[in-house]
């Protein structure tokens, strides 16, 4: 009876872990940022060959200052111009839809590096760092999906090996997603890339340039998924060990 209860909760936690990790992986809101430059209030969003443009109607009569917004995730880094009257970045994202978006692939190019002209050395470093980040994310997602399939196969046959393999994959997934989360925090808050980017923009764009940033829902899904990964992984390992003792 106890093993069935443990199996139920392990399966529930495993399903939640898979859900949160896939949401974190598939949504492009790891970072929310806004740039304000009063000397270029009406500058248009630039695009390059291959960019994806999403066009809607823009209100030309708005008197509020124009702000450039950014959001990024594993797949895309998007930019658009809009107005924000109350200064609440979270409220803006939940209550407003972007009017013009320019989305670029973000696999190897994290915010805030816009192009190679910014800094060649930093640009290459960003690509390498982002590469490790992307690989860790892919390993974490692959491990949690594989672990889920193995557990589904283990349940009908009561195979202790499959339970242990599934639990191990959940633990591996939790570890790599934890690494992904830590690397992202280090990139945004520990390294000086944000401050260097702000100084660069003040020197080359406008003296009163301001950058506001906050973590998005995709980022917040990751540690929740990590917690459930570790919890379900440990439970599946215990279940596998118990099943092994019962049949041997």
From Swiss-Prot:
Protein name per Swiss-Prot or TrEMBL: Transmembrane protein 182
User: Which residues does the record list as glycosylated?
Assistant: 66, 119, 212
The stretches that face the Cytoplasmic side, renumbered to this chain, are: 158-167, 240-248
The family classification in the record reads: Belongs to the TMEM182 family.
Mind telling me which GO cellular component terms the entry cites?
plasma membrane
Per the annotation, which location comes first and is thus the protein's main one?
membrane
Topology feature Extracellular, residues: 27-136, 189-218
Family annotation (Gene3D superfamilies): 1.20.140.150
A Pfam entry, by short name:
Claudin_2
Key words, A-Z: Cell membrane, Glycoprotein, Membrane, Myogenesis, Signal, Transmembrane, Transmembrane helix
Q: What does this protein do?
A: May negatively regulate myogenesis and skeletal muscle regeneration.
Q: Which parts of the chain span the membrane according to its record?
A: 137-157, 168-188, 219-239
So which residues are the signal peptide here?
1-26
Query: What GO biological process term is on the record, naming one?
Result: myotube differentiation involved in skeletal muscle regeneration
């Amino acid at each position: 009876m106890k093993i069935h209860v443990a199996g139920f909760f392990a399966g529930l936690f495993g399903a939640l872990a898979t859900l949160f990790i896939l949401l974190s992986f598939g949504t492009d809101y790891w970072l929310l940022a806004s740039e304000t430059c009063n000397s270029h209030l009406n500058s248009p969003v630039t695009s390059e060959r291959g960019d994806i443009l999403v066009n809607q109607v823009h209100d030309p009569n708005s008197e509020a200052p124009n702000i450039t917004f950014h959001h990024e995730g594993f797949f895309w880094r998007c930019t658009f111009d809009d107005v924000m009257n109350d200064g609440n970045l979270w409220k803006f994202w939940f209550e407003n839809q972007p009017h013009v978006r320019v989305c670029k692939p973000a696999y190897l190019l994290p915010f805030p590096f816009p192009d190679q002209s910014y800094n060649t050395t930093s640009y290459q470093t960003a690509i390498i760092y982002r590469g490790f980040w992307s690989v860790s994310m892919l390993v974490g997602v692959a491990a949690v999906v594989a672990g889920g399939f193995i557990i589904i196969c283990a349940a009908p046959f009561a195979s202790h090996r499959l339970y242990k393999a599934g639990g191990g994959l959940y633990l591996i997934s939790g570890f790599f997603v934890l690494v992904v989360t830590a690397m992202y925090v280090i990139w945004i808050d520990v390294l000086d890339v944000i401050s260097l980017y702000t100084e660069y923009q003040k020197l080359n764009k406008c003296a009163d340039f301001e950058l506001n940033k906050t973590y998005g829902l995709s980022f917040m899904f990751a540690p929740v998924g990590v917690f459930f990964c570790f919890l379900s992984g440990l439970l599946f390992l215990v279940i596998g060990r118990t099943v092994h003792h019962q049949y041997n």
